Swiss-Prot record:
LRR repeat segments: 52-72, 75-96, 99-120, 123-144, 147-168, 169-189, 191-212, 215-237, 238-258, 259-281
Topological relation to the membrane, as annotated: Single-pass type I membrane protein
Subcellular location: Membrane
Sugar-bearing residue positions: N99, N518, N561
Disulfide bonds listed in the record: C407-C418, C412-C428, C430-C439
Function: May act as an inhibitor of TGF-beta signaling.
Pfam families per the UniProt record, alphabetical: LRR_1, LRR_8
Protein known as: Vasorin
Location of the LRRCT domain: 293-346
Primary site of residence: membrane
CDD domains per record: EGF_CA (cd00054)
Domain LRRNT: 20-50
Transmembrane segments: 564-584
Length: 661
């Protein structure tokens, strides 16, 4: 009876293993998380374990989903369907996912959002729809998902956005749509902290448009058509107005209401100078970007270098922050420019014209030629005398031919040609393979790493056989991120081939398993966006030295996943059957030995046991005519002759071979 109970337990365990198996082509190495990344199957994965909380179906080529796709997944918290080919979503397709809090539909082919698309998602907090072809959104599309915290709609084809009546919304991204005018009342979400309106074609941002956003901290207005800082901005910690090429002047008062400002991006504008004291009100400023502006590096801009040295503010993209004019400074970076190169006068008294207060410096009295001047118009009646020869030399530099000296050869780098554009601005025409305002960027120039954000790969946890890597801190500041590339390589082991993982950008962390203990690994993170792969950030880490106490877990299932589950179960069943059979055999033999002691068999009655040896002769096994008579226990014979138990070659070994089970 006891072996029957064992069989029942074994079958129940096998059934549980089958039920909780990983879908074909997916990875299930993290509890309650399924990764189906770049799977070679355009159908939605089947047999997803019902206790799954996080399901990543990233870049699978899926073109359609149905409500039945999510049957049994009521506990799902995160669903990543990004980088597929979904062109439409049936109404109520997600209604059974009442516990879903994160839905990522980035980079599909969706064209519209209906009123019931997100029906039933009352707990949804993050909805990512960026990178689609959405032209219209029903006014009631977001009704019923008032718990939403983040909504991303960038890189679509929206012309008129709906009213966002989402009381808990913290982040709204509408960047790179065709919305040249935003009507008042669109932002009915008073708790928004981060608003991204880049690349919409905005010519102005009325003060009343943002007046209701009292908690606004981050504002992105880059790549629009603005010519001034929008009025009425308060409480911002991050302001980005880069890429507004019509923006040619900035005033001190433009930043006077932003004392909490920490990051400011003024790159890609048409600024030729910055007024002294521009950042006086921004006491908390940590980083500023001034790249790709046509700066006129003369005395009026000389204060900037000194301010950067003493303030400690980081200049972002320093190699792209260069002088445009005058010719002697053209192409030089502001960071390398010396104070004396701004052309400011030396701190000594210099001679001035006669209409100004008299100078205390005069020429040598023995060689001076006096010039008669008109009486000064001021109260002073002193006539200044200066050497005529020196006057001609001092004024000569200001009498150059403007057209001949505006575009000297050294202005454009790497063989670029200089000329004036229709607006009178200096412009460089770069040779093939070079780019930038001054042709300073070559074809193999590595990407400039921002000084402020020299990131390191963050390792969350290291064990004897695994490394858990933080992905969120890497991806949070990167725009248009298509995928994260994680590379892990053993530095000193026998197998130093890199292991490369392509992961979705929404994944907060990832655990690399089945690593060698007490080994050094090189861990790198890279990103793949619209601009191609970026330079990796790497770090070295070391797994712990203690050997793992448990067998490594099978992390990936292939098409034969069911077979891999059944084989161990069948093997265990065979082993159990063998054990039961051995026990039964042993019991029968014990019983047989008892009978032989009491009665004895026919051969034993005669004192002989017939058996064939190698020569076919009959041997006596139990009786020795010359020995003393044996009775009781002394007459027992062994069940097996140890001299006849051996391997497949019949060589005597004296013991049974090991079982393969």
């Amino acid at each position: 009876m006891w072996h029957l109970l064992v069989w029942i337990i074994l079958l129940a365990t096998a059934q549980q293993m089958i039920t909780e198996g990983c879908p074909a082509g997916c990875q299930c190495n993290t509890p309650q998380t399924v990764f189906c990344l770049a799977r070679k199957n355009s159908n939605f994965p089947r047999s997803v374990p019902p206790d799954t909380l996080n399901l990543y179906v990233f870049e699978n080529g899926i073109s359609s989903i149905e409500e039945s796709s999510f049957i049994g997944l009521n506990g799902l918290h995160l669903l990543d369907l990004s980088h597929n080919q979904l062109s439409s979503l049936p109404g109520g397709v997600f209604r059974n996912l009442a516990n879903l809090s994160n839905l990522d539909l980035t980079s599909n082919q969706l064209t519209e959002i209906s009123a019931d698309t997100f029906q039933g998602l009352s707990r949804l907090e993050r909805l990512y729809l960026n990178g689609n072809r959405i032209r219209s959104i029903h006014p009631e599309a977001f009704k019923g998902i008032e718990s939403l915290l983040e909504l991303k709609l960038s890189n679509n084809q929206l012309v008129t956005p709906p009213a966002f009546s989402l009381p808990h919304l913290l982040l709204l991204d509408l960047s790179y749509n065709a919305i040249p005018v935003i009507q008042q009342g669109v932002f009915n979400a008073g708790n928004i902290e981060s608003l991204r309106l880049a690349g919409l074609g905005l010519k102005e941002v009325p003060e009343e448009l943002l007046s209701g956003l009292k908690n606004l901290h981050e504002l992105d207005l880059s790549d629009n058509q603005l010519d001034k800082v929008p009025p009425g901005l308060h409480g911002l910690t991050k302001l980005n107005i880069a890429g507004n090429v019509g923006f040619s002047q900035i005033q001190v008062d433009d930043l006077s209401n932003l004392p909490a400002l920490q990051e400011l991006d003024l790159s890609g504008l048409s600024l030729q100078t910055l007024p002294k004291g521009l950042f006086r009100s921004s006491k908390r400023l940590r980083a500023v970007s001034l790249a790709q502006n046509p700066f006129n590096c003369v005395c009026s801009l000389g204060w900037l270098s000194e301010w950067m040295r003493v303030s400690g503010v980081v200049l972002l993209r320093p190699d792209e922050t260069r002088c445009h004019f005058p010719p002697k400074n053209a192409g030089k970076t502001l960071r390398q420019l010396r104070d004396s190169e701004y052309g400011c006068p030396a701190p000594t008294t210099i001679q001035m014209p006669s209409t100004m207060p008299p100078s205390t410096t005069t020429g040598p009295p023995t060689t001076t030629k006096h010039l008669q001047t008109e009486a000064p118009t001021t109260a002073s009646t002193t006539t200044t005398t200066i050497p005529h020869q020196e006057q001609e030399e001092d004024t000569q530099p200001f009498q150059f031919d403007f057209e001949d000296t505006l575009c000297p050869p050294q202005t454009c780098l790497n063989g670029g040609s200089c000329h004036l554009d229709p607006t009178g601005q200096l412009e460089c025409e770069c040779p093939p393979g070079f780019q930038g305002t001054y042709c300073e960027t070559g074809p193999v120039t590595p990407a400039v790493v921002t000084e402020m954000y020299i990131e390191q790969v963050k390792i969350i946890e290291v064990t004897v056989s695994s490394i858990r890597v933080d992905l969120q801190s890497y991806s949070q500041n990167k725009e248009k991120l298509r995928a994260i590339r994680l590379t892990v390589r053993n530095l000193y082991g026998a197998d130093r081939r890199p292991m490369i993982y392509k992961l979705p950008p929404t994944l907060p962390e990832y655990t690399v398993r089945a690593l060698s203990s007490n080994s050094s690994y090189w861990v790198c993170l890279g990103s793949q966006g619209e601009g191609g792969p970026e330079e990796d950030l790497c770090t070295e880490t070391h797994t712990l030295g203690e050997p793992p106490k448990h067998s490594p877990q099978v992390t990936q299932s292939q098409e034969g996943n069911l077979t891999l589950v059944l084989v161990p179960a069948v093997a265990a069943g065979i082993l159990l059957s063998a054990a039961v059979a051995a026990a039964a055999c042993y019991a029968r033999r014990r019983k047989g030995k008892g009978h032989s002691v009491e009665d004895g068999g026919p051969l034993e009655m005669d004192g002989v046991k017939k058996g064939l040896d190698g020569k076919g002769e009959v041997k006596k096994l139990s009786e020795d005519p010359t020995g003393p008579e044996k009775t009781g226990a002394e007459s027992e014979e062994p069940l097996m002759d140890s001299t006849r138990i051996g391997n497949n070659n019949d060589a005597p070994t004296g013991r049974l071979p090991h079982s393969y089970f």
